[in-house]
């Protein structure tokens, strides 16, 4: 195997969107073109029992939302494609943000009736901060939506990124006729037996259709006043190519995939803690854990650490260093994924995502290296929780299952665990309420451990250096706790309690995280 040639073929990207913009549906269609699924049907088939391939967890199937990031792989047109389907729900932004550290590009799915929504904006900011290319898919043209020119204007005004339309819709909703493909200079037809037609046939096909006349006017305007196409600007994350289509009816998706693979970047390097970039073509293997997922197979209570390979080649059975612990590990049981189905893998290269079976060795953010290399990659973002719950086992006889469940779900980063410094009582912290619901559901369905959860409300979290700590600083308005790394932390009732503490202990420095 020519490793350099293999690395060049890799395209690794995440799909981001606001909930219900159609992200999981487009993922299904891409897998369909990659030959990974035979039936790319409607995603939210709650009554029919057909569920999205990427929404593999029980609660996702029940609720029709993605709450974990799925990893899927397929081959298309000489490229090896790695898709990371991320949760659209805002409570799971932590998982999504970490996933965005493991990709080289992002596909942003926008509901053409709603435009840029809150969660899309948040996720786009992370992508922009990383400087990776963004490709936009304006979805749901089979329904009535907003004017295409308005959608482009919104992209530029709200997200601050220049746009270039690769195609243009001819009507929408019931009047949707197809797409004027600017890049391939052809028409893509929504109705009838023929899929494509030449631009010359446009007038004959559509006659004096007012929508087609509008398209010609819009394109003339774009040619005069629109942005210029620039591959350099796309790769720098300064220009987003925009595709219109309908994921539900699988229209415009294949054209999008083919053009996307032409312009999406090869695997890029990753920054170490000293600021130096590790090149994907370095011969030595390196990678980092961006996600840990327990119970992908509930029958086996397994845990998988997802690793983005940054450089070199993985070979089954190889030994790696874990600089965080100073110990080594052997990578003998490694898989690649199509949502919940998986296959053992013997080789993988930079750009690939592999799943390493984990018995408690790894943590999110861990670096894996080989030989004399003991460097670490830049830390992944962590988030300070905003709302808290006290948690305990409902049945004292189930303490073992309760502790195992908490330990595994906390290591995934699904929720954060704190212990009351004085009483040892467990407290969970989360970014949003849905995280608690998912935690409770998974504890009961995957670990057979019913839990009692009591709300503590919102808290302002600050860390304190162990040498500055005096337990008498704690009060009912600022609970003293330990985080899961046993570091002391205060949970303040509100900002007033925090200011009161700062006035009382002016020499004590409190630390705030992201």
Curated annotation (Swiss-Prot):
Pfam families in UniProt: EF-G_D2 (PF22042), GTP_EFTU (PF00009), RF3_C (PF16658)
Record-linked PROSITE patterns: G_TR_1, G_TR_2
Subcellular location: Cytoplasm
GO CC annotation: cytosol
UniProtKB keywords: Cytoplasm, GTP-binding, Nucleotide-binding, Protein biosynthesis
Keyword flag GTP-binding: yes
Ranges where the tr-type G domain occurs: 8-268
InterPro entries documented for this protein: EF-G-like_DII, EFG_III/V, G_TR_CS, P-loop_NTPase, PrfC, RF3_C, RF3_dom_3_sf, RF3_GTP-bd
Binding site for GTP: 17-24, 85-89, 139-142
GO MF annotation, one: GTPase activity
Cysteines engaged in disulfide bonds, as pairs: none
GO biological process: regulation of translational termination
Function: Increases the formation of ribosomal termination complexes and stimulates activities of RF-1 and RF-2. It binds guanine nucleotides and has strong preference for UGA stop codons. It may interact directly with the ribosome. The stimulation of RF-1 and RF-2 is significantly reduced by GTP and GDP, but not by GMP.
Similarity comment text for this entry: Belongs to the TRAFAC class translation factor GTPase superfamily. Classic translation factor GTPase family. PrfC subfamily.
Protein name per its UniProtKB record: Peptide chain release factor 3
Source organism of the structure: Streptococcus pneumoniae (strain P1031)
């Amino acid at each position: 195997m020519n490793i350099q040639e293999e690395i060049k073929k890799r395209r690794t990207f995440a799909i981001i969107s606001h909930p219900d913009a159609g992200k999981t549906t487009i993922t299904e269609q891409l897998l369909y073109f990659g030959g990974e699924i035979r039936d790319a049907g409607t995603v939210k088939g709650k009554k029919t029992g057909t569920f999205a391939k990427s929404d593999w967890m029980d609660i996702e199937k029940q609720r029709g939302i993605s709450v974990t990031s799925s990893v899927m792989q397929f081959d298309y047109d000489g490229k090896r494609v790695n898709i990371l389907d991320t949760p659209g729900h805002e409570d799971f932004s932590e998982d999504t943000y970490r996933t965005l550290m493991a990709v080289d590009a992002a596909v942003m799915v926008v509901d053409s009736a709603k435009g840029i929504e809150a969660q899309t904006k948040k996720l786009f900011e992370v992508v922009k901060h990383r400087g990776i290319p963004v490709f936009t898919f304006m979805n749901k043209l089979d329904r009535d939506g907003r004017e295409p020119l308005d959608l482009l204007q919104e992209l530029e005004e709200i997200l601050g990124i220049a746009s270039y339309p690769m195609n243009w819709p001819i009507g929408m909703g019931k009047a949707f006729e197809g797409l004027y493909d600017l890049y391939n200079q052809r028409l893509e037809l929504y109705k009838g037996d023929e899929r494509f037609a030449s631009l010359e046939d446009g007038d004959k096909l559509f006659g004096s259709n007012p929508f087609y006349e509008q398209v010609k006017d819009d394109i003339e305007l774009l040619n005069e006043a629109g942005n210029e196409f620039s591959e350099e600007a796309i790769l720098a994350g300064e220009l987003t190519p925009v595709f219109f289509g309908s994921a539900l009816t699988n229209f415009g998706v294949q054209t999008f995939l083919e053009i996307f693979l032409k312009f999406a970047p090869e695997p890029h390097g990753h920054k170490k803690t000293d600021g130096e970039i590790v090149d994907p073509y370095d011969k030595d293997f390196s990678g980092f854990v961006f996600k840990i997922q327990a119970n992908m197979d509930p029958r086996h209570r397994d845990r998988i650490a997802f690793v983005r390979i940054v450089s070199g080649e993985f070979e089954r059975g190889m030994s790696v260093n874990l600089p965080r612990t100073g110990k080594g590990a052997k990578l003998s049981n490694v898989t690649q994924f199509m949502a919940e189905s998986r296959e053992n893998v013997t080789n993988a290269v930079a750009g690939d995502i592999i799943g390493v079976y984990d018995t408690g060795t790894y943590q999110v953010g861990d670096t894996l290296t080989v030989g004399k290399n003991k460097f670490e990659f830049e830390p992944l973002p962590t988030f300070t929780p905003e709302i808290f719950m006290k948690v305990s086992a409902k049945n004292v006889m189930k303490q073992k299952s309760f502790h195992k469940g908490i330990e595994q779900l906390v290591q995934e980063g699904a929720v954060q665990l704190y212990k009351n410094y004085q009483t040892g009582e467990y407290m969970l912290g989360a970014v949003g309420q849905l995280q608690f619901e998912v935690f409770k559901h998974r504890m009961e369905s995957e670990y057979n451990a019913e839990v009692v959860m009591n709300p503590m409300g919102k808290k302002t979290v600050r860390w304190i250096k162990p040498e500055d700590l005096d337990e008498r600083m704690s009060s009912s308005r600022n609970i003293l706790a330990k985080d899961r790394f046993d570091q002391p932390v205060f949970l303040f009732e509100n900002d007033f309690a925090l200011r009161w503490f700062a006035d009382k202990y002016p020499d004590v420095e409190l630390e705030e995280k992201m």
